[in-house]
A protein has these predicted regions:
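A structural helix-start
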Residues: 1-2
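Acidic donor-binding segment of Leloir-type glycosyltransferases
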Residues: 5-49
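Solvent-exposed polar/charged
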Residues: 10, 65-66
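Active-site acidic Asp-centered loop
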Residues: 23, 75-76, 84
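Short, acidic/glycine-rich phosphate-metal binding loop used to engage nucleotide
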Residues: 48-56
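Catalytic-site signature of metal-activated, phosphate-bearing donor transferases
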Residues: 56-64, 80-193
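Short beta-strand-to-loop acidic/aromatic patch adjacent to the donor-nucleotide binding site
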Residues: 69-80
């Protein structure tokens, strides 16, 4: 999370607010990393707490309620946006005023993955090692009470009428790197929801 927050504060506009929502079970190290940014003005940084309770939609809806801007770019703690995406996003939103939500391409990489893992999960892996690219994620949407998340896992956004896909180009991507141990742990957790 510290890497993401450092990156966002280096590349965001002053008028953009970063809202971090922490699960009540977050480790002391994660809390410490997030609290280290609390010297930022309130209109630029907000740290909140919410129990996940195995319900990602409810968790994301709580985050939405705590965002003050016109738009929400929901980024997971283990993701990082391409720098160009952050630079271009205000212009994309302004040029497409009727669009309410955007699908963002995501580059997934898993260190330590084997052919057995790929076959087991039915993944497609590119020559670059990108898994299931473009792995579209609905992550940019208007901050509107009528736009909300459903489903506890593999959540889906509802309430918007007009959407668009960003180009399936690395410049517009979220990066989602992990190792095989973390991937297996996440898959096991999702199976309990």
């Amino acid at each position: 999370i510290k890497k993401l927050l450092t990156f966002l504060f280096e590349h965001k506009r002053k008028e953009d607010q970063v809202v971090v929502q922490m699960d009540t079970s977050a480790t002391k190290e994660v809390w410490s990393a997030c609290e280290s940014f609390e010297g930022k003005p309130f209109d630029e940084y907000k740290l909140i707490e919410c129990a996940l309770n195995k319900n990602f939609a409810q968790y994301k809806n709580n985050l939405n309620k705590n965002c003050d801007g016109d738009w929400i770019f929901q980024i997971d703690a283990d993701e990082l946006p391409n720098e160009y995406l952050l630079e271009a996003l205000p212009f994309i939103l302004e040029a497409n005023a009727e669009t309410e939500a955007y699908w963002v391409p995501r580059v997934n990489t898993v260190a330590g993955i084997t052919e057995n893992h790929i076959a087991k999960w039915g993944w497609r892996v590119s020559d670059e090692g990108w898994i299931n690219f473009p792995d579209w994620q609905m992550r940019i949407y208007r901050n509107d009470e009528n736009i909300y998340w459903i489903k506890p896992v593999h959540e889906q956004l509802r309430g918007y009428t007009k959407f668009a896909n960003l180009p399936a180009d690395e410049s517009y991507c979220l990066y989602h790197p992990k190792n095989i141990g973390r991937q297996e742990t996440q898959n096991a957790f999702y199976d309990t929801i």
